[in-house]
Amino acid sequence: MGKTIVIKCGGSVLSDLSPSFFTSLQEMYAQGMNIVLVHGGGPEIGQMLKRLNVPSEFVNGLRKTTKEVLEVAEMVLAGKVNKQLVALLRQHGLPAVGVSGVDACLLQAAPIDLAKLGYVGEVVNVNADFVHQLLKSRYIPIISPIGADKDGQKYNINADTAAGAVAKAIKAAQLLFVTDVPGILRNGSIVEQATIDVIERMMNEGIITGGMIPKVKAAIAALSESLHEVMIVSGKTPFYENGQLHGTTIRNEVGVY
């Protein structure tokens, strides 16, 4: 099989994905790459909770997930957002399969802190064989981050950490975090590569601010012995052209600033 790329699309960028995003996917697929998409859906979940008058709150940046909130989260993530993405890829001639982390025990989860966060989970195991079977058949798995434990209890999982867990488990060559900007910007120019210490310095100096902070933190957290680099890319402009990825590469090794 060809090189495997995991792409994480946050809920906030899903509605802004441009035709060039899908053109990049088409080019990667045509070149024999294996593509896995992991998506979020925070804004959509928030809107649905409000519409259904289901109370919710955030604790340390994570949505406290009661049984009622979990039902809505699963409905939105697995039922709505996932299938919208499958349909979008189909429109662009790409064979996608939408799955939840519950399917085939894809994302086995355990509670992070049941008392404080409710049914918010962390990934303790990934069914890599299932993903590889889909990739071998040249499907593009689109994964919604709802997992379950061995007893079938479901959990809402942060999409960033789910994407990192999947990338590590299937030994992906690259993990891309899709944002609304073409990468980390410094004085209006893209920082093409940086190391963890450089990223931390840029945060301290106020070069990386706002919504980019959790994105780079998630990217850093995904780095491991098997995953040496991750990228911040744009969903609004081509992120892959002529065999080249465009964005900011974050790696463990020595980079530039």
UniProtKB/Swiss-Prot annotation:
It is found in: Cytoplasm. Its EC number is 2.7.2.8. It catalyses: N-acetyl-L-glutamate + ATP = N-acetyl-L-glutamyl 5-phosphate + ADP. It is an enzyme of class 2 (transferase). This is Acetylglutamate kinase. Pfam families: AA_kinase. Pathway: Amino-acid biosynthesis; L-arginine biosynthesis; N(2)-acetyl-L-ornithine from L-glutamate: step 2/4.
